[in-house]
Amino acid sequence: MLFRSAELIPINGEYKTSVIYHPMDGRIPRREGFLDFHAKRRASGLKDTDGPEGQNLSGRCLMFGAAVPSLTPGMMNPNLQIVQTKDHIMVLTEMIHDARIIRINENHLPFNIPQWMGDSVASWEGDTLVVHSINFRPEQSSSRTITLSDEFELTERYTLVSDDEILYEFTVVDNKAYEQPFSGHRILTRNRPEERVYEYACHEGNYSLPGILAGARRLESENNN
């Protein structure tokens, strides 16, 4: 099944002004003073241009957007391809070609094995697929979308509400990064049968990262002369 994740579509007959419905003001309740992985790195004296590790994940062709790409609507390449087997569900994001593997009716992995997009397990509650994810890699924290700590916990609910629509709901709990849990929802709309997910060949055309680092080394060399 191929779904588009960036449509502005009414939920229960209403066009929403925010994906967030709890808290009621529609805002993410960020905790003032919280330092995530990247902020701690900068506070220690490291610069974003010291090495590739300081650059954002999309610039390194690793991931794009939030801890789980389906959390935030994409501005481009917003397609999600959902593949289901008896024991697993795979959600492929077209942007940077992220493939998220979700195990059905399994236990979480040991906490000392952090995962890109978290360790995700799922179960069915009637016709709703409930996905619980923990143990995200700290590098996935993003000040532009979803900030996270080692306590970040995500619960998602996927409910088919028509032949062509999935109601997608999520709740984030992270007492270090946020003042309180927050929840959001939106509609995923099925694409036309002829639509396809295309390969996102990021590394092959990624000239920006070596250029950024080379420019930083050039400036350092000039300043030392």
What spans do the regions from the language model cover?
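PEST-like low-complexity, intrinsically disordered acidic/proline/serine-rich tracts
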Residues: 1-225
